[in-house]
Design a protein with these regions (language model features):
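Active-site anion-handling motifs in enzyme catalytic cores
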Residues: 1-209
Length: 209
C-alpha cells in the first residue's frame, strides 16, 4: 500500500522534515523561506504543508499555514505513518547527511525521504550538505536515498553524493533569499543585551563539512 497518492485537482500534501523546534535560527529561517517559496509557486489552494517539530512550544507562531507535527524521540514508526499520508517529502536541514552534527537527525531525514521514495513519491533534499559520515549513516544514505534528488548547497556535497550514487543539483542555502527584519531591530536587541552601540560585533559561524 503506497498510501496517499496525488491526483489532479487536489492539493499536494507536502511534508517538511528538518531540525525545527529547538530555536536553531538557521534551521527555522531556512524553512520559513522554503515555505514562502512553495506558497508562491503553488498558491495556498494547491498545497497543504506539514512540518516536524521537536518541541511545538518553540515553534509556536512560526511557519504560517503549515500544520506542525510533534515528532517523538523514537521516531521510526512515526515516520512511516506520517509519510504514508503525504504525497511528497522535502528534507530541509543544512546538515542533511553528516555525522559531525547528529547522526540521529540525518537518520530521520534519510528515513523520511527513503520512505517517500519506496512509495513512489517525490523525495527531495533541499539546500542541504553531505559531508563526513560514520560507516552506518553512510550505508543508510547510500541504500535509501538513491531514488531521491538532493539540491545541494555546495560542490563538495555534490561530490560526496556522487560517490554514493545519489542524484544532485547545485544550488544554495534557501536562507540567502529570506527577508530579514530592519537593521534597527537587530541593533536594539544588541543594546538590550548590553551593547554600547559603538564596539564592533564579531559573529562566527564555523562549520566543517
Amino acid at each position: 500500500d503506497p498510501g496517499a497518492q496525488w491526483k489532479p485537482g487536489e492539493p499536494l500534501k507536502l511534508l517538511l522534515a528538518g531540525y525545527n523546534g529547538t530555536r536553531n535560527t538557521g534551521a527555522d529561517v531556512r524553512v520559513e523561506e522554503m515555505i514562502r517559496q512553495f506558497r508562491h509557486l503553488f498558491g495556498d489552494e494547491h498545497v497543504e504543508m506539514s512540518i516536524y517539530t521537536i518541541d511545538p512550544e518553540k515553534t509556536r507562531g512560526y511557519f504560517r499555514t503549515v500544520r506542525q507535527l510533534h515528532i517523538p524521540k523514537i521516531f521510526p514508526r512515526y515516520l512511516f505513518d506520517t509519510v504514508h499520508t503525504h504525497h511528497a517529502v522535502v528534507a530541509c536541514e543544512g546538515s542533511m547527511f553528516k555525522s559531525k552534527f547528529a547522526s540521529a537527525l540525518s537518520t530521520m531525514m534519510v528515513g523520511s525521504i527513503g520512505l517517500a521514495a519506496a512509495e513512489q513519491k517525490l523525495a527531495i533534499g533541499y539546500g542541504g550538505e553531505a559531508g563526513d559520515m560514520d560507516e552506518g549513516l553512510r550505508a543508510l544514505v547510500e541504500r535509501y536515498c538513491r531514488e531521491a534528488l538532493i539540491l545541494a548547497r555546495n560542490r563538495e556535497s555534490q561530490e560526496v553524493l556522487r560517490e554514493l550514487g545519489i542524484a544532485s543539483r547545485y544550488g544554495t542555502d534557501t536562507a540567502w533569499t529570506f527577508t530579514p527584519a530592519a537593521p534597527e531591530v537587530g541593533a536594539q536587541l544588541l543594546r538590550d543585551a548590553g551593547w554600547d552601540g559603538v564596539t564592533p560585533v564579531l559573529a562566527l559561524c564555523p562549520i566543517n563539512p
